[in-house]
């Protein structure tokens, strides 16, 4: 009987730890950091070494409180490399206090209200001739088209990029990592 109880306890412990491992693996690593679906967009983003420029910009624009709120939000999060693709001096100029409004406009152009997964983008694209269009918090649209096995993103000016990591679930929405800064 003792052996049976010990075996049952060990089996239960393995089952619980196994499900915890599976739960932890549902979100991809981003910028070398684990992303936790129980944390907010800001709480997770600050841990990504690939998003230090974005985090600095969110702070400079005064959007930390908003993106820490209940949302839900879908954030198309440009990497540091995406910001480096902008013309020289652009990021430094945007981060200046006198350009806070312009910076907020650029950043909110990367945010769509609600939780929109890659499956949602796919369904909308399928229903609309291959293109999914979403209106951003900034007020202008972002367009998405299938590119290979992933999704391309395009702003209203024709700048194109790709979603490089999709469906990073957050407590207040979802992040999709993108390789290009979209400009309103």
Provide a role label for each language-model segment:
Residues 21-184:
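Mature, structured domains of secreted/extracytosolic soluble proteins
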Residues 8-19:
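Bacterial N-terminal signal peptides
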